[in-house]
Amino acid sequence: MATIHIIEDDWGVRDALIELVRGFGHRVAAYADGEAFMQAGTPLPDDVIFVDLGLPGVGGQHVIKWLKGLAQPPRVVAISGRSRGDIEAALRDLPNLPLLRKPLAAESITPYLEERGRPSRRCSP
């Protein structure tokens, strides 16, 4: 089973994403910064990584470039609440990277939770 990794420094956003992803029956690993994520070990190719571009310390762009440089990179999705200009500058060297703008909606996240071509289904509480 793939793991959904959430790298987000805002605890409220991180907690909401954890609950949403778990509600769809996925295994979740969450990190408050890029350093903690990178120290946790290399993600698997089937994993999905949601990365906030505005991380403190090791920034989201650095984490994404590291992930894209892996022999078998996982699916990566950038998230940001920054202005359009800031986002475009941050992603200039990262073409074709999916981006979700904050505030996040469940409908924008669920397509990235598909596993092996099967859509995620909401689990009953």
Where do the language-model regions lie?
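Short amphipathic alpha-helix used as the core "switch/output" element in two-component signaling
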Residues: 61-72
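C-terminal output helix
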Residues: 86, 104-116, 121
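The feature encodes the CheY-like receiver
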Residues: 56
